[in-house]
Amino acid sequence: MDRETRTFAERYYRDLRDPVPSGGGGPTPSGVTFIQTPNAFSYADFVKGFLLPNLPCVFSSAFTEGWGSRRRWVTSEGKPDFEYLQQKYGDAVVPVANCGVREYNSNPKEHMSFRDYISYWKDYIQGSYSSSRGCLYLKDWHLCRDSLVNDLEDIFTLPVYFSSDWLNEFWDVLNVDDYRFVYAGPRGTWSPFHADIFRSFSWSVNICGKKKWLFFPPGEEEALRDCHGNLPYDVTSTELLDTHLYPKIQHHSLPIEVIQEPGEMVFVPSGWHHQVYNLDDTISINHNWVNGCNLPNMWHFLQQELQAVQHEVEEWKDSMPDWHHHCQVIMKSCTGINFEEFYHFLKVIAEKRLLVLEQGLKGDSGDSRSLDLGLQQAAFDIGRLADVLASVVVNPDFQRVDTSAFSPQPEELLQQLEDAVAAAEAL
């Protein structure tokens, strides 16, 4: 990030009415921008045109032309190279969802060896895309986290546009998880209607095959809720024509449809609900990521999640000792993170950015790997962290969290960030 882009981004957030927005974007677009040429599209262009206004876009296959996975995982006919994949990753244990079975608003999963999944996939194709085992979709395979393969860095090259990735930076520090996934499945596999975890951004690249995306801008999903307040499993279902079951359906807008070709890269903004279909035999690489641009959306989402938990167990509020603590425990189980872990997430990123800024102000470049996007990015990140942490520390539910063992204390960390924001004005 350069100084001009940082200034632009900081002004953008100052001009917002609510310093911690509830998670929308700009005006609803009529279509999605297609970005053709890598050399003609900068990181600053992406920040200003898509990241800040929270709008989707599609990058051409030229952006992923050098990826090893596009050379090795795919045959000359553009199909999955089953023989190579089975030889390379056959022993890996992978999660597989049955797209033909609904379990709440998702699909039931099982685990099998990648070798067995490839065998199923080949049989499925030979059976005219049908099987008594159902329509199985390999989803959420943590290849980067789990693989013992030595050449993982050649599978893909992280595009600079997505390199400010706090979510995976945090989990890499803990060395226990990540949000980098491989998806693979035959024609007809699909993902039900959803918004991405923690209201993260995501990006998705088709290594081979073709996808159809149905996008709904933030807020549009409200018209799709049924009379009980639940979102649909499948937005194309004729069930949605029942106005008694879906009383707001007449107010809904048509989705924005995107066809993603082989090699193309889709940017999914924060809070955009979507439904995705594989139109061909398809393999994709997908990342979820959070940074200073959607951190407020993540914080807003976590507050909503806690409120939902509190509503469900409201009747035990007066009789259950440590009711607020139990709500945090339930939230952690259901959402994957609670307020305590969110503070730890903020702290890890904040301390790394404060170190980069301290080194920069001293004229010491330090470890160049500490932040690929540079000193101005660190300064911008610190400002966003300060804004959100200021909201966190005054939140009544966070104030009920036992922070006695936190180091530094939240108020102390906030002061460090605010001091750093002031110091960064000179950069």
Swiss-Prot record:
Keywords: Cytoplasm, Dioxygenase, Iron, Metal-binding, Oxidoreductase
Catalytic function, reaction form: L-lysyl-[protein] + 2-oxoglutarate + O2 = 4-hydroxy-L-lysyl-[protein] + succinate + CO2
Source organism, top-level taxon: Eukaryota
UniProt-listed InterPro entries: Cupin_8, JmjC_dom, JMJD6_ArgDemeth/LysHydrox
Pfam families registered for this protein in UniProt: Cupin_8 (PF13621)
Matching SMART domains: JmjC (SM00558)
Enzyme's top EC category: oxidoreductase
Cofactor field: Fe(2+)
Localization in the cell: Cytoplasm
A cellular component annotation (GO) from this entry: cytoplasm
Record EC number: 1.14.11.-
GO biological process, one term: protein hydroxylation
Binding-site positions, Fe cation: H194, D196, H274
SUPFAM superfamilies: Clavaminate synthase-like
Name of the molecule in the record: 2-oxoglutarate and iron-dependent oxygenase JMJD4
Organism this protein belongs to: Mus musculus (Mouse)
Gene of this entry: Jmjd4
